[in-house]
Amino acid sequence: MDFMTIEEVAAKWGITPRQVRSYCANNRIAGAALEQGEWRIPANAAKPERKRRRTFPTTILGILEAERSSRISGGLYHRLQIDITYNSNHIEGSRLTHEQIRWIFETKTLGEIGADVPVDDIVETANHFRAVDKVIITASSALTEAYIKRLHEILKSGTSDSRKDWFAVGEYKRLDNVVGEMETCPAKDVHREMAKLLAWWKSADKTFENLLDLHVRFEQIHPFQDGNGRVGRLILLKECLKYNITPFVIAENFKQFYYLGLQDWRHGRRARLMDTCRTGQDVFILGLRQFGHAKLAEKAEAVQKTSERQGTRIYTLSMV
């Protein structure tokens, strides 16, 4: 068998002698032998493939998807699932505590839950976890009527509502409804109004302010018999992830500001809702830092400061 020196192999492979020595020392060249202080390498030895550097997600969506698929516990995905499920359901009247929801998510069991907690609260909690996964997995998909109906179907499957003849799970409402004193879109007009809304969003600039406008208009249509608020907030999460807008969770203790902000928006006063959601963005950025994503947090903060300085309301970010 013919052998080559370190220098000859380096010239043949187009790399440095130091790299060849490293390959030899780490047993990455078959047949290489050290004799009297010199490496002898078979002339027909194959060049080792370079180890690929580990790549890290550069967007929030990438982080969430990586942690979800690898089932990492105690990270950003873990925190988001628990926080958004607790707050979004609590806004709608769920009696489960944050700790109880954490327990259900982490153990897939009920633990010690009082008899006064409605079964629907438990079912809708599990369903909400699935809906958040759906949003993360399909965030890049187009926002369509079929997609929105699927979110509603996931949320309401197996609930007491799903067994009512007049309640349409995964379909638009059959009966007219109201929200407080606000009239919503008549059932017969929902498809038309939703089509118009989604057509507008498709062509609109994907800014923070326009995203909130989408949310307000969706809630005013109120396309489903129940579950509109939770579906609407899931849409917010999806589109934030898709368009690299800093996500936010509407905290339950900001419920009053959130509802007042929705009302104000319809009358041309946008500050309250925007400030409420910006607060949620600030909390999310703190979470990025807490879980080791400082560079992404810095990028988000820089974009926000630039937007405020320029007098705009565009809150987008990307590491790319």
What are the language-model segments listed below?
Residues 1-13, 17-22, 26-28, 34-320:
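FIC/Doc superfamily catalytic core
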